[in-house]
Amino acid sequence: MSDTPQAILLMGPTASGKTGLALELARRFPVEIVSVDSALVYRDMDIGTAKPTAEEMAACPHHLIDVISPLQSYSAAQFHADANRLIADIQARGKLPLLVGGTMLYYKALLEGLSDLPQADAALRAELDADAALLGWPAMHARLAELDPATASRLNPNDSQRIHRALEVCLLSGKPMSELIAQGKEAAAGFRFLPLALVPRERGWLHARIAERFRIMLEQGFLDEVSRLRAKYPELTLNLPSMRCVGYRQAWEHQDGLYGHDEFVERGVAATRQLAKRQLTWTRSLDAIPVDAQRDGLAGLLGDAVDDFLAGRPPAESLRYAGDF
């Protein structure tokens, strides 16, 4: 196997069949699966996140599942560091990293790098706001052009939010924001990825799968799971990232009597559809190969693409889905 860090990325919207396809690939290749899902990191949240079953996880090693409490948070920066470490570790064991999930921000961090930008500073922000109120944003844009011409050249002189952030980064770090972003992309360029994105040929197909999966989760005891979470973690609130996972807020509010069971199901399914729509929007912005999730024999075609990737060949052009999604 190549010494260059390399991995297969299998992304796609919720309920598009990623887990099943990943397990099919695990039967053909010596893979270890790394979850790319901001919901699967939480312990005790199994049903509502459609976490792989114990049997599925026993089929091959899985990583980044059940790593934190629902009271904690997990950032894209943490994922980026963990994924880079795991890719290296898995490859050192002679295995192939297979990254699977639907958190597109995490994929963006892998494919485009994660820039080491400084955190916002309240005092500097207030100072820049005062300058802008006095001078106007075109003058602040001219100031940015002196410090970071590359960033200024792509911003409208009245784009206050982005000019503000670019100036803040320059003044806090002592470096142009464009330089810091380029460094992140340079680090990402040291990896070889085969980015495969499952997309639905028909939106109705995906919507039907979403509704069916929500029905199955209810049969499996999703509402009981939410009750157990609330009992086990008294500090849990709807403001925590874990409870922003699709379905959990709706279940919580249903249990609190805000609406009945039928409306809870409608809201849960609708929220999942909205998530899928956002995931597909993200997918269009990423440099990934769109693949028809409804295509017959898809597992074999993806396996052939992995064979080509490992041999240093480009995937067959026939794999790429040319339609709208």
From Swiss-Prot:
Annotated keywords: ATP-binding, Magnesium, Nucleotide-binding, Transferase, tRNA processing
Pfam families: IPPT
Molecular-function annotations in GO: ATP binding; tRNA dimethylallyltransferase activity
UniProt-recorded name of the protein: tRNA dimethylallyltransferase
Region (Interaction with substrate tRNA), start-end ranges: 37-40, 161-165, 244-249
Binding site for ATP: 12-19
Cofactor(s) demanded: Mg(2+)
Species per Swiss-Prot/TrEMBL record: Chromobacterium violaceum (strain ATCC 12472 / DSM 30191 / JCM 1249 / CCUG 213 / NBRC 12614 / NCIMB 9131 / NCTC 9757 / MK)
GO annotation terms (biological process): tRNA modification
